[in-house]
Amino acid sequence: PRATAAFVLRINEETGEPIFKYPMTEIGSQGFFTVKIEDSGAFAYKLITEGEQAAEFYDPYSFGYSVDPVNVMKVVNGDDGILSDFHVKDLFGARQITLDGVQGVSFCMNMPGATRVSVVGDFNGWDGRVNPMRRIDYTDMFELFIPGDLMNTRYKFEALYRDGNTDIFADPYAEVYEVAPGNASVLAKLEYSWLDS
């Protein structure tokens, strides 16, 4: 939303080297950009934005689900079979993962009654329009993979409800939180060497 220009950068899938830069056209004044690329088939790409929000990044929406939809459906349906081998942290909250060879963070949250859930944080100006999450079919669960190094950044979830109200809340599955009054969740890798046997 704070970009003044945007481009699709076609890259070599193996080396990541740039091949061609397609300019995008802004639609309206809300920072929504689009481009139609004719007859090129699927290709690897990054997005480039200029202006206040200048960046080069992989498109979060070009990746498949970062959580296993089968496990999501098992949780939704209350399948006891998943509980013997399942850890809540393996599905919900924020987890550092590698997806399609790209490192990033998987976000997943169950939000009954929400029409939109977004990840907001230091990395997107706390703007819920930047990283809206995808609803997993037939559930109230939302997920999104955000590529890149987000370690030591603060984040929360923003939910928009049918009545138009929004709520911003910390990740209940986070391991590290900002001190009050902010109370944001913090993406951090906890490493501790236990000394007992």
What residues fall within each predicted segment?
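Short Gly/aromatic-enriched secondary-structure transition segments
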Residues: 9-13, 122-124, 133, 172-174
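Short strand-turn-strand beta-turns centered on an Asx-Gly dipeptide
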Residues: 9-11, 50-51, 120-122, 160
